[in-house]
Amino acid sequence: IAIGITVPGFVDVKSNMIEQVPHFDLSTPWDLANHVAERFNLPTYIGHDVRSLALAEHYFGVTKDCYDSLLLRIHRGVGAGIVINHELFSGYKRNVGEIGHIQVDPLGKRCMCGNVGCLETVVSNSAIENKMSELLEDGYQSKWLSLEAHDIEAICKASNKQDAVATELIEHVGTQIGRVLAMSVNMFNPEKIVISGEITQAKNVLFAAIRRTLESHALPAFVQNTPLVASELSNE
Protein backbone atom coordinates (compact mmCIF):
# COMPACT_ATOMS: atom_id res chain seq x y z
CA ILE A 1 0.00 0.00 0.00
CA ALA A 2 1.23 3.48 -0.86
CA ILE A 3 -0.06 7.02 -1.37
CA GLY A 4 0.08 8.80 -4.71
CA ILE A 5 -0.35 12.57 -5.06
CA THR A 6 -0.66 14.39 -8.37
CA VAL A 7 -0.14 18.12 -8.77
CA PRO A 8 0.14 20.63 -11.62
CA GLY A 9 3.40 22.42 -12.33
CA PHE A 10 6.93 21.01 -12.36
CA VAL A 11 7.57 17.77 -10.50
CA ASP A 12 10.87 15.93 -10.07
CA VAL A 13 9.72 12.32 -9.82
CA LYS A 14 13.28 11.13 -9.11
CA SER A 15 13.66 13.22 -5.97
CA ASN A 16 9.90 13.16 -5.23
CA MET A 17 9.93 16.96 -4.93
CA ILE A 18 7.50 19.58 -6.20
CA GLU A 19 9.53 22.30 -7.91
CA GLN A 20 6.82 24.68 -9.09
CA VAL A 21 3.03 24.94 -8.76
CA PRO A 22 0.92 27.47 -10.70
CA HIS A 23 -0.39 30.32 -8.55
CA PHE A 24 1.84 29.32 -5.61
CA ASP A 25 5.12 31.03 -4.75
CA LEU A 26 7.59 28.26 -3.92
CA SER A 27 10.97 29.73 -3.03
CA THR A 28 12.41 26.22 -2.64
CA PRO A 29 11.27 22.76 -3.79
CA TRP A 30 8.39 21.41 -1.70
CA ASP A 31 8.95 18.06 0.02
CA LEU A 32 5.24 17.29 0.35
CA ALA A 33 5.70 13.55 -0.19
CA ASN A 34 7.99 13.19 2.83
CA HIS A 35 5.58 15.09 5.09
CA VAL A 36 2.65 12.90 4.01
CA ALA A 37 4.73 9.72 4.34
CA GLU A 38 5.69 10.63 7.92
CA ARG A 39 2.10 11.51 8.80
CA PHE A 40 0.56 8.26 7.51
CA ASN A 41 3.59 5.97 7.76
CA LEU A 42 3.18 4.91 4.13
CA PRO A 43 5.40 5.31 1.05
CA THR A 44 4.27 8.43 -0.81
CA TYR A 45 4.96 9.42 -4.40
CA ILE A 46 4.45 12.66 -6.30
CA GLY A 47 3.38 12.81 -9.93
CA HIS A 48 2.27 15.42 -12.46
CA ASP A 49 -1.51 15.61 -12.74
CA VAL A 50 -1.85 15.56 -16.55
CA ARG A 51 0.85 12.99 -17.20
CA SER A 52 -0.63 10.80 -14.46
CA LEU A 53 -4.04 11.16 -16.12
CA ALA A 54 -2.56 10.06 -19.45
CA LEU A 55 -1.09 7.00 -17.76
CA ALA A 56 -4.37 6.22 -15.97
CA GLU A 57 -6.21 6.54 -19.27
CA HIS A 58 -3.73 4.09 -20.79
CA TYR A 59 -4.26 1.55 -18.01
CA PHE A 60 -8.01 1.93 -17.45
CA GLY A 61 -9.57 4.21 -20.07
CA VAL A 62 -9.95 4.91 -23.76
CA THR A 63 -6.28 4.37 -24.67
CA LYS A 64 -5.76 0.99 -23.02
CA ASP A 65 -5.86 -0.56 -26.50
CA CYS A 66 -3.14 1.78 -27.86
CA TYR A 67 0.64 1.64 -28.09
CA ASP A 68 0.88 5.42 -28.49
CA SER A 69 -1.49 8.20 -27.43
CA LEU A 70 -1.65 11.91 -26.78
CA LEU A 71 -3.88 13.35 -24.07
CA LEU A 72 -4.73 17.04 -23.82
CA ARG A 73 -6.15 18.22 -20.50
CA ILE A 74 -7.97 21.56 -20.31
CA HIS A 75 -8.92 22.97 -16.91
CA ARG A 76 -7.37 25.93 -15.08
CA GLY A 77 -4.39 25.38 -17.35
CA VAL A 78 -3.61 23.29 -20.41
CA GLY A 79 -1.20 20.37 -20.51
CA ALA A 80 -0.46 17.18 -22.40
CA GLY A 81 0.50 13.63 -21.51
CA ILE A 82 2.22 11.43 -24.08
CA VAL A 83 2.38 7.64 -24.04
CA ILE A 84 4.84 5.94 -26.42
CA ASN A 85 5.13 2.15 -26.72
CA HIS A 86 3.01 1.69 -23.58
CA GLU A 87 5.29 3.95 -21.52
CA LEU A 88 4.77 7.49 -20.30
CA PHE A 89 7.14 9.85 -22.09
CA SER A 90 8.79 12.05 -19.46
CA GLY A 91 12.11 13.07 -20.96
CA TYR A 92 15.47 13.57 -19.29
CA LYS A 93 14.28 16.45 -17.10
CA ARG A 94 11.00 14.67 -16.29
CA ASN A 95 8.85 17.66 -17.27
CA VAL A 96 7.32 17.52 -20.75
CA GLY A 97 3.95 18.25 -22.30
CA GLU A 98 3.60 21.96 -21.50
CA ILE A 99 1.54 22.35 -24.66
CA GLY A 100 -0.45 25.17 -23.08
CA HIS A 101 2.55 27.47 -23.45
CA ILE A 102 2.83 27.23 -27.22
CA GLN A 103 2.06 30.66 -28.63
CA VAL A 104 -1.11 30.90 -30.74
CA ASP A 105 -1.69 34.67 -30.65
CA PRO A 106 1.40 36.95 -30.81
CA LEU A 107 -0.81 39.93 -29.94
CA GLY A 108 -2.74 38.11 -27.24
CA LYS A 109 -2.90 38.33 -23.48
CA ARG A 110 -0.01 37.93 -21.08
CA CYS A 111 0.29 34.39 -19.75
CA MET A 112 1.27 33.52 -16.18
CA CYS A 113 4.49 32.04 -17.62
CA GLY A 114 5.51 35.53 -18.78
CA ASN A 115 4.97 35.00 -22.50
CA VAL A 116 2.17 36.44 -24.63
CA GLY A 117 -0.66 34.63 -26.38
CA CYS A 118 -0.06 31.11 -25.09
CA LEU A 119 -2.71 28.50 -25.87
CA GLU A 120 -3.64 28.55 -22.19
CA THR A 121 -4.67 32.22 -22.45
CA VAL A 122 -7.24 31.26 -25.08
CA VAL A 123 -8.64 27.83 -24.23
CA SER A 124 -8.38 27.31 -20.45
CA ASN A 125 -11.68 27.38 -18.57
CA SER A 126 -11.06 30.85 -17.16
CA ALA A 127 -9.96 32.17 -20.57
CA ILE A 128 -13.18 30.91 -22.16
CA GLU A 129 -15.29 32.36 -19.36
CA ASN A 130 -13.50 35.72 -19.56
CA LYS A 131 -13.93 35.85 -23.33
CA MET A 132 -17.63 35.13 -23.00
CA SER A 133 -17.92 37.91 -20.43
CA GLU A 134 -16.27 40.31 -22.89
CA LEU A 135 -18.64 39.25 -25.68
CA LEU A 136 -21.71 39.73 -23.50
CA GLU A 137 -20.47 43.12 -22.33
CA ASP A 138 -19.95 44.09 -25.98
CA GLY A 139 -23.62 43.43 -26.69
CA TYR A 140 -23.65 39.89 -28.05
CA GLN A 141 -26.98 38.28 -27.24
CA SER A 142 -27.52 34.83 -25.76
CA LYS A 143 -30.74 33.15 -24.73
CA TRP A 144 -28.93 30.92 -22.25
CA LEU A 145 -26.05 33.03 -20.91
CA SER A 146 -25.74 36.27 -18.96
CA LEU A 147 -23.04 38.30 -17.21
CA GLU A 148 -24.15 36.60 -13.98
CA ALA A 149 -24.16 33.05 -15.36
CA HIS A 150 -21.55 32.11 -17.96
CA ASP A 151 -19.24 29.52 -16.44
CA ILE A 152 -17.69 26.81 -18.61
CA GLU A 153 -20.50 24.33 -18.03
CA ALA A 154 -23.15 26.92 -18.91
CA ILE A 155 -21.25 27.84 -22.07
CA CYS A 156 -21.06 24.19 -23.12
CA LYS A 157 -24.76 23.67 -22.46
CA ALA A 158 -25.59 26.78 -24.48
CA SER A 159 -23.45 25.54 -27.35
CA ASN A 160 -25.26 22.20 -27.27
CA LYS A 161 -28.51 24.15 -27.63
CA GLN A 162 -27.09 25.87 -30.74
CA ASP A 163 -26.65 29.23 -29.02
CA ALA A 164 -24.82 31.32 -31.62
CA VAL A 165 -22.35 33.17 -29.39
CA ALA A 166 -21.46 30.06 -27.36
CA THR A 167 -21.07 27.93 -30.48
CA GLU A 168 -18.82 30.51 -32.13
CA LEU A 169 -16.62 30.69 -29.05
CA ILE A 170 -16.32 26.90 -28.73
CA GLU A 171 -15.47 26.66 -32.43
CA HIS A 172 -12.74 29.28 -31.99
CA VAL A 173 -11.34 27.34 -29.05
CA GLY A 174 -11.41 24.13 -31.08
CA THR A 175 -9.55 25.78 -33.92
CA GLN A 176 -6.76 26.97 -31.63
CA ILE A 177 -6.52 23.55 -29.99
CA GLY A 178 -6.41 21.92 -33.41
CA ARG A 179 -3.50 24.07 -34.54
CA VAL A 180 -1.36 23.08 -31.58
CA LEU A 181 -2.43 19.45 -31.74
CA ALA A 182 -1.45 19.38 -35.41
CA MET A 183 2.13 20.22 -34.43
CA SER A 184 2.08 17.42 -31.87
CA VAL A 185 0.59 14.95 -34.33
CA ASN A 186 3.29 15.76 -36.87
CA MET A 187 5.95 15.12 -34.21
CA PHE A 188 4.55 12.03 -32.44
CA ASN A 189 2.00 10.49 -34.85
CA PRO A 190 -0.16 9.16 -31.98
CA GLU A 191 -2.50 6.22 -32.40
CA LYS A 192 -5.27 8.12 -30.59
CA ILE A 193 -5.88 11.69 -29.34
CA VAL A 194 -7.77 12.22 -26.08
CA ILE A 195 -9.30 15.48 -24.86
CA SER A 196 -10.01 15.85 -21.15
CA GLY A 197 -11.84 18.57 -19.27
CA GLU A 198 -15.20 20.22 -18.74
CA ILE A 199 -15.15 21.60 -22.28
CA THR A 200 -15.77 18.10 -23.63
CA GLN A 201 -19.38 18.63 -22.55
CA ALA A 202 -19.61 20.50 -25.88
CA LYS A 203 -17.65 17.85 -27.76
CA ASN A 204 -19.89 17.79 -30.84
CA VAL A 205 -19.03 21.39 -31.68
CA LEU A 206 -15.53 21.29 -30.17
CA PHE A 207 -14.37 18.07 -31.82
CA ALA A 208 -15.69 19.10 -35.23
CA ALA A 209 -13.59 22.28 -35.07
CA ILE A 210 -10.52 20.39 -33.85
CA ARG A 211 -10.91 17.76 -36.57
CA ARG A 212 -11.27 20.37 -39.33
CA THR A 213 -8.12 22.13 -38.18
CA LEU A 214 -6.16 18.91 -37.76
CA GLU A 215 -7.04 17.84 -41.28
CA SER A 216 -5.89 21.16 -42.70
CA HIS A 217 -2.71 21.54 -40.62
CA ALA A 218 -1.34 18.04 -39.93
CA LEU A 219 0.13 15.51 -42.33
CA PRO A 220 -2.82 13.68 -43.94
CA ALA A 221 -1.20 10.28 -43.43
CA PHE A 222 -0.80 10.98 -39.71
CA VAL A 223 -4.28 12.30 -38.96
CA GLN A 224 -6.53 10.56 -41.47
CA ASN A 225 -7.47 7.57 -39.33
CA THR A 226 -6.52 8.92 -35.90
CA PRO A 227 -9.47 8.78 -33.46
CA LEU A 228 -10.29 11.91 -31.45
CA VAL A 229 -12.11 10.98 -28.25
CA ALA A 230 -13.11 12.37 -24.86
CA SER A 231 -11.42 11.10 -21.72
CA GLU A 232 -13.38 8.63 -19.62
CA LEU A 233 -11.55 9.79 -16.50
CA SER A 234 -11.90 13.56 -16.94
CA ASN A 235 -13.47 14.41 -13.62
CA GLU A 236 -12.31 11.50 -11.48
List each model region and its residues.
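Residues that form or immediately flank small-molecule/cofactor binding pockets and catalytic motifs
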Residues: 23, 49-51, 93, 107, ...
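Glycine-rich phosphate-binding loop and adjoining helix at the ATP-binding site
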Residues: 1-68, 205-216
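ATP-binding/phosphotransfer module of carbohydrate and carboxylate kinases, centering on a glycine-rich
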Residues: 1, 15, 38-42, 106-107, ...
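Structural motif
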Residues: 61-64, 94, 185, 221
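Glycine-rich phosphate-binding loop of actin/hexokinase-like ATP-binding domains
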Residues: 64-123
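Short secondary-structure boundary segments
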Residues: 7, 48, 74-76, 125-126, ...
